[in-house]
UniProtKB/Swiss-Prot annotation:
It comes from the Bacteria. NCBIfam families: RNAse_H_YqgF. GO terms for biological process: rRNA 5'-end processing. It is found in: Cytoplasm. This is Putative pre-16S rRNA nuclease. CDD domains: YqgF. GO terms for molecular function: nuclease activity. It is an enzyme of class 3 (hydrolase). One of its GO terms (cellular component) is cytosol.
């Protein structure tokens, strides 16, 4: 079974999936969403969950640097509750502080153009979040 990693934004949802052993995370795709209208791409997520045999979902939880919860962390909590209800799978909120910055640094180091970075940053951030979670399980 595999673990799904998600990085929630207001307009996009970064998606990553673990390998079958739960050792590595791979960025999969970015799904266009509309958080204000409550459209979270659940149809596509269901297809991914079924295709990869996902048994756990990890959602990035963007705490403030001092550990407090701001509006984005609260949005992630609401999203996690919707995921639990929709998919009946365990959902883990995982501290994602600096994950997008780490993903950005990796892409810059790989000499990825700014235009291409914009297209892949969300799925890369999801992979960073998921890899952090997977590493904690070993």
């Amino acid at each position: 079974m595999r673990t799904l990693g998600l990085d929630l934004g207001t307009k996009t949802l970064g998606v990553a999936v673990s390998d079958e052993f739960g050792w590595t995370a791979q960025g999969l795709e970015t799904i266009a969403i509309d958080e204000e209208r409550g459209h979270y791409g659940f149809e596509r997520l269901r297809a991914i969950i079924d295709e990869y045999g996902v048994d756990t979902i990890v959602v990035g939880w963007p705490k403030n640097m001092n550990g407090t919860l701001g509006p984005r962390a609260e949005a992630s909590e609401r999203f996690a509750a919707k995921l639990r209800e929709e998919f009946s799978l365990p959902v883990v909120l995982w501290d994602e502080r600096l994950s997008t910055m780490a993903a950005e640094r990796m892409l810059i180091a790989a000499d990825v153009s700014r235009k291409k970075r914009r297209k892949v940053i969300d799925k890369m951030a999801a992979a960073v979040i998921l890899q952090s979670y997977l590493d904690s399980k070993r």
